[in-house]
């Protein structure tokens, strides 16, 4: 997020003021027994991977039960929707205003792909789709952020280094 601060911002209704956030409060869309809840992991930029994982577990467990404290539902700056958790493969995510971007992650699938020698091999594929507020973000910015994000998923040690 620090390389793409516009993704961690909000715009007012008449698009006359853009506010950048210092904290990265990442919303996690959860299919709960009372409907969609989006609690957020506060200040992700200040947490290590273990702290993020523990907070993710706490928030998703409480959200699934419909018992998320109100303070955990406020202040999100960008959201992630894991439609793969309920079997989905692709979706067009809907922006959680006043946020300006959201990503939807599909389920991991093993699909046939060609390798560098033209042979068909099984590859792990996850569909990722973004929605962004075009008053603030252009497609190129989202594409570059997505490429960086993809590189981190493919090389977790690089992600760990970036988080330190």
Give the ranges of each region predicted by the language model.
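C-terminal catalytic/motor cores of large multi-domain enzyme assemblies
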Residues: 2-164
């Amino acid at each position: 997020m620090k390389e793409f601060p516009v993704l961690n911002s909000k715009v007012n209704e008449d698009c006359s003021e853009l506010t950048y956030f210092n904290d990265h409060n990442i919303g996690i869309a959860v299919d709960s027994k009372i409907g969609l809840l989006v609690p957020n992991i506060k200040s992700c930029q200040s947490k290590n991977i273990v702290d993020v994982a523990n907070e993710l577990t706490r928030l998703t467990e409480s959200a699934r039960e419909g018992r998320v404290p109100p303070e955990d539902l406020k202040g999100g700056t960008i959201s992630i929707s894991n439609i793969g958790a309920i079997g989905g493969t692709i979706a067009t995510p809907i922006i959680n205003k006043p946020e300006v971007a959201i990503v939807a992650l599909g389920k991991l699938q093993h699909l046939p792909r060609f390798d560098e020698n033209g042979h068909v091999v099984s590859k792990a594929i996850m569909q990722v789709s973004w929605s962004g507020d075009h008053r603030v973000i252009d497609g190129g910015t989202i594409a570059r952020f997505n490429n960086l994000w993809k590189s981190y998923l493919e090389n977790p040690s690089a992600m760990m280094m970036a988080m330190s």
